[in-house]
Protein backbone atom coordinates (compact mmCIF):
# COMPACT_ATOMS: atom_id res chain seq x y z
CA UNK A 1 0.00 0.00 0.00
CA UNK A 2 1.59 3.27 -1.18
CA UNK A 3 0.23 6.08 0.98
CA UNK A 4 3.36 8.24 1.10
CA UNK A 5 1.57 11.29 -0.36
CA UNK A 6 -1.84 10.69 1.18
CA UNK A 7 -3.04 13.89 2.88
CA UNK A 8 0.14 15.80 2.03
CA UNK A 9 -1.63 18.44 -0.07
CA UNK A 10 -5.03 20.09 -0.04
CA UNK A 11 -7.29 22.08 -2.31
CA UNK A 12 -7.77 25.50 -0.75
CA UNK A 13 -9.55 27.41 -3.50
CA UNK A 14 -12.03 26.73 -6.30
CA UNK A 15 -13.59 28.93 -8.97
CA UNK A 16 -15.79 28.68 -12.04
CA UNK A 17 -16.92 31.08 -14.74
CA UNK A 18 -19.30 31.25 -17.67
CA UNK A 19 -21.15 28.03 -16.88
CA UNK A 20 -23.69 27.38 -19.63
CA UNK A 21 -23.42 30.26 -22.08
CA UNK A 22 -20.75 32.94 -21.91
CA UNK A 23 -21.34 35.09 -24.95
CA UNK A 24 -18.36 37.17 -26.02
CA UNK A 25 -15.70 35.37 -23.97
CA UNK A 26 -12.86 33.29 -25.33
CA UNK A 27 -11.63 30.04 -23.74
CA UNK A 28 -8.59 31.75 -22.18
CA UNK A 29 -10.77 34.52 -20.73
CA UNK A 30 -13.08 31.98 -19.08
CA UNK A 31 -10.05 30.09 -17.78
CA UNK A 32 -8.61 33.32 -16.44
CA UNK A 33 -11.82 34.37 -14.71
CA UNK A 34 -12.13 30.98 -13.02
CA UNK A 35 -8.46 31.01 -12.01
CA UNK A 36 -8.66 34.45 -10.40
CA UNK A 37 -11.77 33.34 -8.49
CA UNK A 38 -10.01 30.21 -7.24
CA UNK A 39 -6.93 32.15 -6.16
CA UNK A 40 -9.07 34.71 -4.31
CA UNK A 41 -11.11 31.90 -2.75
CA UNK A 42 -7.86 30.44 -1.44
CA UNK A 43 -6.93 33.75 0.22
CA UNK A 44 -3.88 34.03 -2.02
CA UNK A 45 -2.59 36.51 -4.58
CA UNK A 46 -1.84 35.83 -8.23
CA UNK A 47 1.83 36.36 -7.41
CA UNK A 48 1.67 33.42 -4.98
CA UNK A 49 1.03 30.94 -7.80
CA UNK A 50 4.26 29.30 -8.88
CA UNK A 51 2.96 26.02 -10.33
CA UNK A 52 0.54 25.79 -13.28
CA UNK A 53 -1.23 22.69 -14.58
CA UNK A 54 -3.47 23.08 -17.61
CA UNK A 55 -5.04 21.15 -20.46
CA UNK A 56 -7.27 22.75 -23.05
CA UNK A 57 -8.77 21.84 -26.39
CA UNK A 58 -7.84 25.21 -27.87
CA UNK A 59 -4.13 25.68 -27.11
CA UNK A 60 -1.27 23.55 -28.40
CA UNK A 61 0.94 24.78 -25.54
CA UNK A 62 -1.53 25.37 -22.71
CA UNK A 63 0.84 26.29 -19.90
CA UNK A 64 2.66 28.83 -22.09
CA UNK A 65 -0.65 30.45 -23.02
CA UNK A 66 -2.08 30.38 -19.50
CA UNK A 67 1.01 31.75 -17.82
CA UNK A 68 1.39 34.55 -20.36
CA UNK A 69 -2.29 35.49 -20.10
CA UNK A 70 -2.27 35.55 -16.29
CA UNK A 71 1.20 37.08 -16.01
CA UNK A 72 2.68 34.18 -14.07
CA UNK A 73 6.36 33.23 -14.18
CA UNK A 74 6.10 29.72 -12.72
CA UNK A 75 8.70 27.48 -11.17
CA UNK A 76 6.94 24.36 -12.42
CA UNK A 77 4.38 23.60 -15.15
CA UNK A 78 2.67 20.53 -16.58
CA UNK A 79 0.49 20.50 -19.69
CA UNK A 80 -0.38 16.80 -19.69
CA UNK A 81 -3.45 16.28 -21.87
CA UNK A 82 -5.14 12.89 -21.67
CA UNK A 83 -8.56 14.31 -22.52
CA UNK A 84 -11.27 15.05 -19.99
CA UNK A 85 -9.47 13.07 -17.27
CA UNK A 86 -6.44 15.41 -17.39
CA UNK A 87 -7.48 17.37 -14.31
CA UNK A 88 -7.72 14.32 -12.07
CA UNK A 89 -4.22 13.44 -13.27
CA UNK A 90 -3.13 17.01 -12.50
CA UNK A 91 -4.21 16.50 -8.86
CA UNK A 92 -1.62 13.73 -8.62
CA UNK A 93 1.05 15.63 -10.54
CA UNK A 94 0.55 18.83 -8.55
CA UNK A 95 0.79 16.87 -5.30
CA UNK A 96 4.06 15.30 -6.42
CA UNK A 97 5.46 18.68 -7.43
CA UNK A 98 4.39 20.32 -4.16
CA UNK A 99 5.82 17.49 -2.07
CA UNK A 100 9.11 17.66 -3.97
CA UNK A 101 9.36 21.39 -3.26
CA UNK A 102 9.21 22.25 -6.95
CA UNK A 103 6.42 24.76 -6.31
CA UNK A 104 4.47 26.12 -3.35
CA UNK A 105 1.03 26.96 -4.76
CA UNK A 106 -0.35 25.02 -7.72
CA UNK A 107 -3.11 26.21 -10.04
CA UNK A 108 -5.08 23.66 -12.08
CA UNK A 109 -7.26 25.32 -14.71
CA UNK A 110 -9.45 24.93 -17.79
CA UNK A 111 -11.68 27.03 -20.03
CA UNK A 112 -13.82 26.54 -23.12
CA UNK A 113 -16.46 28.48 -25.06
CA UNK A 114 -17.53 25.42 -27.02
CA UNK A 115 -21.23 26.30 -27.01
CA UNK A 116 -21.19 29.96 -28.00
CA UNK A 117 -18.35 29.36 -30.45
CA UNK A 118 -20.75 27.09 -32.31
CA UNK A 119 -18.94 23.88 -31.44
CA UNK A 120 -20.72 20.61 -31.98
CA UNK A 121 -20.29 17.48 -29.92
CA UNK A 122 -17.52 16.04 -32.05
CA UNK A 123 -13.99 14.97 -31.22
CA UNK A 124 -10.72 14.45 -33.05
CA UNK A 125 -9.41 12.33 -30.19
CA UNK A 126 -9.43 9.19 -32.37
CA UNK A 127 -6.73 8.11 -34.82
CA UNK A 128 -8.99 8.66 -37.80
CA UNK A 129 -7.46 6.04 -40.08
CA UNK A 130 -9.13 3.25 -38.07
CA UNK A 131 -12.73 4.35 -38.57
CA UNK A 132 -12.99 6.96 -41.34
CA UNK A 133 -14.24 4.46 -43.89
CA UNK A 134 -17.34 3.81 -41.76
CA UNK A 135 -18.17 7.52 -41.38
CA UNK A 136 -18.71 7.51 -37.59
CA UNK A 137 -19.60 10.59 -35.61
CA UNK A 138 -16.89 10.97 -33.00
CA UNK A 139 -17.10 10.43 -30.14
CA UNK A 140 -20.76 9.39 -30.00
CA UNK A 141 -20.47 6.39 -32.29
CA UNK A 142 -17.76 4.85 -30.10
CA UNK A 143 -19.83 5.18 -26.94
CA UNK A 144 -22.90 3.80 -28.68
CA UNK A 145 -20.84 0.72 -29.60
CA UNK A 146 -20.05 0.20 -25.92
CA UNK A 147 -23.71 0.69 -24.99
CA UNK A 148 -24.87 -1.76 -27.69
CA UNK A 149 -22.40 -4.39 -26.58
CA UNK A 150 -23.39 -3.99 -22.93
CA UNK A 151 -27.05 -4.37 -23.86
CA UNK A 152 -26.32 -7.47 -25.92
CA UNK A 153 -24.01 -9.11 -23.40
CA UNK A 154 -25.77 -8.29 -20.13
CA UNK A 155 -29.36 -7.47 -21.04
CA UNK A 156 -29.03 -3.80 -20.16
CA UNK A 157 -32.05 -1.86 -21.43
CA UNK A 158 -32.57 1.58 -22.89
CA UNK A 159 -34.80 2.31 -19.90
CA UNK A 160 -31.86 1.62 -17.59
CA UNK A 161 -29.64 3.96 -19.60
CA UNK A 162 -32.40 6.57 -19.31
CA UNK A 163 -32.38 6.18 -15.50
CA UNK A 164 -28.88 7.70 -15.51
CA UNK A 165 -30.05 10.82 -17.35
CA UNK A 166 -33.14 11.17 -15.17
CA UNK A 167 -31.11 10.87 -11.96
CA UNK A 168 -28.64 13.48 -13.18
CA UNK A 169 -31.48 15.86 -13.99
CA UNK A 170 -32.97 15.42 -10.52
CA UNK A 171 -29.65 16.50 -9.03
CA UNK A 172 -29.41 19.40 -11.49
CA UNK A 173 -32.83 20.61 -10.40
CA UNK A 174 -31.29 21.18 -6.95
CA UNK A 175 -28.35 23.13 -8.42
CA UNK A 176 -29.07 26.73 -9.48
CA UNK A 177 -25.89 26.78 -11.60
CA UNK A 178 -26.88 23.75 -13.70
CA UNK A 179 -27.49 24.57 -17.36
CA UNK A 180 -30.29 22.03 -17.99
CA UNK A 181 -33.08 22.06 -15.41
CA UNK A 182 -36.71 21.07 -15.42
CA UNK A 183 -38.63 17.82 -15.67
CA UNK A 184 -37.12 14.80 -17.43
CA UNK A 185 -38.70 11.34 -17.39
CA UNK A 186 -37.57 7.98 -18.69
CA UNK A 187 -40.18 8.35 -21.43
CA UNK A 188 -38.70 11.75 -22.33
CA UNK A 189 -35.24 10.25 -22.71
CA UNK A 190 -36.57 7.35 -24.76
CA UNK A 191 -38.55 9.66 -27.03
CA UNK A 192 -35.76 12.15 -27.65
CA UNK A 193 -33.98 12.23 -31.01
CA UNK A 194 -31.89 9.17 -31.79
CA UNK A 195 -28.28 10.25 -32.35
CA UNK A 196 -26.38 6.98 -32.56
CA UNK A 197 -28.38 3.89 -31.72
CA UNK A 198 -29.00 3.16 -28.84
CA UNK A 199 -28.08 6.64 -27.57
CA UNK A 200 -30.59 9.47 -27.93
CA UNK A 201 -29.82 13.15 -27.54
CA UNK A 202 -30.84 12.89 -23.87
CA UNK A 203 -28.25 10.12 -23.37
CA UNK A 204 -25.55 12.55 -24.48
CA UNK A 205 -23.80 15.22 -22.44
CA UNK A 206 -24.45 18.92 -22.84
CA UNK A 207 -22.42 21.25 -25.04
CA UNK A 208 -21.77 24.32 -22.85
CA UNK A 209 -19.24 27.02 -22.14
CA UNK A 210 -17.35 27.10 -18.87
CA UNK A 211 -14.13 27.72 -17.02
CA UNK A 212 -12.96 26.00 -13.85
CA UNK A 213 -9.93 26.11 -11.57
CA UNK A 214 -8.61 24.98 -8.21
CA UNK A 215 -5.55 25.79 -6.09
CA UNK A 216 -3.50 23.27 -4.10
CA UNK A 217 -0.87 23.86 -1.43
CA UNK A 218 0.93 21.61 1.03
CA UNK A 219 -1.19 20.50 3.96
CA UNK A 220 0.75 22.45 6.60
CA UNK A 221 0.12 25.70 4.73
CA UNK A 222 -3.52 24.83 3.99
CA UNK A 223 -4.44 24.98 7.66
CA UNK A 224 -3.57 28.69 7.77
CA UNK A 225 -5.77 29.68 4.82
CA UNK A 226 -9.44 30.79 5.00
CA UNK A 227 -11.25 27.70 3.74
CA UNK A 228 -11.54 24.25 5.21
CA UNK A 229 -8.85 22.24 3.39
CA UNK A 230 -9.99 19.44 1.11
CA UNK A 231 -7.19 16.90 1.19
CA UNK A 232 -5.76 14.85 -1.66
CA UNK A 233 -5.98 11.20 -0.59
CA UNK A 234 -4.85 9.33 -3.67
CA UNK A 235 -5.06 8.97 -7.44
CA UNK A 236 -4.13 6.62 -10.26
CA UNK A 237 -4.46 6.56 -14.02
CA UNK A 238 -4.67 3.76 -16.57
CA UNK A 239 -5.02 3.59 -20.34
CA UNK A 240 -5.38 0.53 -22.56
CA UNK A 241 -6.21 2.02 -25.95
CA UNK A 242 -6.80 5.24 -27.85
CA UNK A 243 -9.07 4.23 -30.73
CA UNK A 244 -12.20 2.37 -29.66
CA UNK A 245 -11.46 -0.35 -32.24
CA UNK A 246 -8.37 -1.20 -30.15
CA UNK A 247 -10.37 -1.42 -26.91
CA UNK A 248 -9.84 -4.95 -25.56
CA UNK A 249 -13.44 -5.34 -24.36
CA UNK A 250 -16.15 -2.77 -25.09
CA UNK A 251 -17.74 -3.46 -21.70
CA UNK A 252 -14.61 -3.14 -19.52
CA UNK A 253 -12.67 0.12 -19.14
CA UNK A 254 -9.28 0.82 -17.61
CA UNK A 255 -11.17 2.24 -14.60
CA UNK A 256 -11.03 -1.35 -13.39
CA UNK A 257 -7.26 -0.79 -13.01
CA UNK A 258 -7.10 2.86 -11.96
CA UNK A 259 -9.84 2.48 -9.33
CA UNK A 260 -8.22 -0.21 -7.16
CA UNK A 261 -4.81 1.50 -7.30
CA UNK A 262 -6.28 4.86 -6.30
CA UNK A 263 -8.35 3.25 -3.55
CA UNK A 264 -5.24 1.52 -2.23
CA UNK A 265 -3.32 4.81 -2.10
CA UNK A 266 -6.25 6.57 -0.43
CA UNK A 267 -6.65 3.77 2.11
CA UNK A 268 -10.43 3.64 1.71
CA UNK A 269 -13.09 1.06 0.92
CA UNK A 270 -16.31 1.43 -1.05
CA UNK A 271 -18.22 1.73 2.21
CA UNK A 272 -16.18 4.85 3.10
CA UNK A 273 -17.19 6.76 -0.05
CA UNK A 274 -19.88 9.40 0.49
CA UNK A 275 -19.87 10.96 -2.99
CA UNK A 276 -19.14 9.51 -6.42
CA UNK A 277 -18.37 12.00 -9.20
CA UNK A 278 -18.20 10.22 -12.56
CA UNK A 279 -17.43 11.61 -15.99
CA UNK A 280 -20.85 11.05 -17.55
CA UNK A 281 -20.27 12.11 -21.14
CA UNK A 282 -22.95 9.55 -22.04
CA UNK A 283 -25.34 7.50 -19.94
CA UNK A 284 -23.38 4.31 -20.61
CA UNK A 285 -20.33 5.86 -18.91
CA UNK A 286 -21.99 5.93 -15.52
CA UNK A 287 -23.02 2.30 -15.80
CA UNK A 288 -19.59 1.14 -16.95
CA UNK A 289 -17.72 3.11 -14.28
CA UNK A 290 -19.96 1.98 -11.42
CA UNK A 291 -19.13 -1.59 -12.45
CA UNK A 292 -15.44 -1.11 -13.14
CA UNK A 293 -14.89 0.87 -9.93
CA UNK A 294 -16.45 -1.96 -7.94
CA UNK A 295 -19.77 -0.55 -6.79
CA UNK A 296 -21.58 -3.44 -8.46
CA UNK A 297 -20.58 -6.57 -10.41
CA UNK A 298 -19.84 -6.39 -14.13
CA UNK A 299 -23.08 -6.47 -16.06
CA UNK A 300 -25.20 -5.31 -13.12
CA UNK A 301 -24.79 -1.56 -13.70
CA UNK A 302 -28.10 -1.13 -15.47
CA UNK A 303 -30.03 -2.79 -12.68
CA UNK A 304 -27.92 -0.96 -10.09
CA UNK A 305 -29.08 2.50 -11.22
CA UNK A 306 -32.77 1.65 -11.33
CA UNK A 307 -35.44 3.02 -9.00
CA UNK A 308 -33.58 6.24 -8.22
CA UNK A 309 -30.62 4.55 -6.57
CA UNK A 310 -28.18 7.25 -7.74
CA UNK A 311 -30.70 10.11 -7.62
CA UNK A 312 -31.32 12.47 -4.67
CA UNK A 313 -32.39 10.37 -1.70
CA UNK A 314 -30.93 7.21 -3.24
CA UNK A 315 -28.46 4.80 -1.70
CA UNK A 316 -25.42 6.20 -3.55
CA UNK A 317 -24.89 9.91 -4.30
CA UNK A 318 -23.63 10.15 -7.88
CA UNK A 319 -22.94 13.40 -9.78
CA UNK A 320 -24.68 15.70 -7.33
CA UNK A 321 -24.17 18.79 -9.51
CA UNK A 322 -26.16 17.24 -12.35
CA UNK A 323 -23.11 15.92 -14.15
CA UNK A 324 -22.10 16.43 -17.73
CA UNK A 325 -25.59 15.32 -18.71
CA UNK A 326 -27.42 18.21 -17.04
CA UNK A 327 -25.00 20.64 -15.33
CA UNK A 328 -22.03 21.55 -17.50
CA UNK A 329 -19.85 20.00 -20.20
CA UNK A 330 -17.58 22.48 -22.02
CA UNK A 331 -15.66 19.95 -24.10
CA UNK A 332 -13.61 18.59 -21.18
CA UNK A 333 -15.52 17.98 -17.95
CA UNK A 334 -12.95 16.64 -15.48
CA UNK A 335 -12.28 19.99 -13.79
CA UNK A 336 -15.89 20.23 -12.71
CA UNK A 337 -15.78 16.88 -10.91
CA UNK A 338 -13.20 18.47 -8.63
CA UNK A 339 -15.20 21.64 -8.05
CA UNK A 340 -18.36 19.76 -7.04
CA UNK A 341 -16.47 17.38 -4.73
CA UNK A 342 -14.80 20.30 -2.96
CA UNK A 343 -18.13 22.13 -2.70
CA UNK A 344 -19.77 19.09 -1.09
CA UNK A 345 -16.90 18.37 1.31
CA UNK A 346 -16.91 22.03 2.39
CA UNK A 347 -20.68 21.73 2.94
CA UNK A 348 -21.41 24.61 0.57
CA UNK A 349 -23.73 22.80 -1.84
CA UNK A 350 -27.00 24.36 -0.72
CA UNK A 351 -30.16 22.37 -1.43
CA UNK A 352 -28.21 19.42 -2.85
CA UNK A 353 -25.82 19.19 0.12
CA UNK A 354 -25.24 15.65 1.31
CA UNK A 355 -25.79 14.93 4.99
CA UNK A 356 -22.31 13.42 5.27
CA UNK A 357 -19.51 14.05 2.81
CA UNK A 358 -16.02 13.30 4.09
CA UNK A 359 -14.70 11.19 1.21
CA UNK A 360 -15.34 11.73 -2.50
CA UNK A 361 -14.35 9.52 -5.41
CA UNK A 362 -13.71 11.38 -8.66
CA UNK A 363 -13.35 9.51 -11.92
CA UNK A 364 -12.24 11.20 -15.12
CA UNK A 365 -12.54 9.82 -18.64
CA UNK A 366 -10.65 10.89 -21.75
CA UNK A 367 -10.97 10.06 -25.43
CA UNK A 368 -13.38 7.22 -26.21
CA UNK A 369 -13.31 5.35 -22.89
CA UNK A 370 -9.53 5.62 -23.31
CA UNK A 371 -7.82 7.51 -20.47
CA UNK A 372 -9.19 6.64 -17.03
CA UNK A 373 -8.07 8.50 -13.89
CA UNK A 374 -9.49 7.93 -10.43
CA UNK A 375 -8.85 10.32 -7.53
CA UNK A 376 -9.98 10.63 -3.92
CA UNK A 377 -10.50 13.82 -1.93
CA UNK A 378 -11.42 14.08 1.73
CA UNK A 379 -12.11 16.31 4.69
CA UNK A 380 -9.93 16.50 7.80
CA UNK A 381 -12.07 13.72 9.26
CA UNK A 382 -10.84 11.41 6.48
CA UNK A 383 -7.19 11.75 7.46
Model-identified regions with their sequence ranges:
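Extended C-terminal subregions enriched in glycine
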Residues: 252-256, 260-283, 292, 325-329
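Short glycine/threonine-rich loop-to-helix capping motif typified by GTGT followed
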Residues: 59-69, 244-248, 280-303, 314, ...
